[in-house]
Amino acid sequence: MKIALFSDIHANLPALEAVLADIDRRQPDATYCLGDLVGYNIWPNEVIAEIRKRNIPTIAGNYDFGIGRSSDDCGCAYKTDEEKANGKVSISYTNDRVGDEERAYLRTLPVHIRVDFHLANDPEHLWSSTETFSLLLVHGSPRRINEYLFEDRDEKSLLRIFEQANADVICFGHTHKPYHRILTGGDEATRFYHAVNLGSVGKPKDGDPRACYVLLTIPESAHAGSSESVEVEFVRVEYDVEKAAQAVENSRLPNDYAESLRKAR
């Protein structure tokens, strides 16, 4: 089974359109969005409309959670006073632009989606002989919508998160930096866990300004005892970055956000 997953669009319509066109071309079996549809760019309503039009299963990001409740707190972790000041402008701007219908939609979004694959070893006794391979979709982490799971997270800490979530694969976003880590654990037999950060469609921070999403392939032979039960492809998609950057500069959003798009920082 091939699944397309993307996250952190952040109101960047040109980036989303490019990603969706690429997904359409590849024709996966399923598509999921892991949140943060709004914030930092000028097209929050248009992004929400596109996701709704396609009926893409979507979870709430921290920014969606805040805007859905007309809050002036996006649950973001800003490092400097300048970032905090810019962040206040962004959430005020987004609250002003998002319509009532779009805001109501954001409030309906769940905080996680679990997809269980029941892998039958004996077709005549499906339930009694089935192994479950579990995929958990979250925005930040299974514990908090705005928890950052960076690539250098301590392995023991990350394993605890997997064990508490009872998941074989956890896909998430929030950091805007893509990676795939394979961890091993389990008492009786080795069990492999996959941590997959999807990166960002509309606001990458890994030095590559192209939009990013993931194609996740789960073969029929998938099981927790194999490190090859999940194939992860990070797909980078060109889009008109300059159009998005100039749109920011022509709005009351901070110009720093335009440079962030150009430099992916």
Could you describe each region identified by the protein language model?
Residues 47, 54-116, 121-124, 132, ...:
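Active-site neighborhood of divalent metal-dependent phosphoester bond hydrolases
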Residues 15, 37-54, 67-79, 181-184, ...:
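Metal-dependent catalytic neighborhoods of phosphoester/phosphodiester hydrolases
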Residues 6-7, 31-36, 57-62, 138, ...:
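Active-site neighborhood of phospho(di)ester-bond hydrolases with catalytic His/Asp-centered motifs
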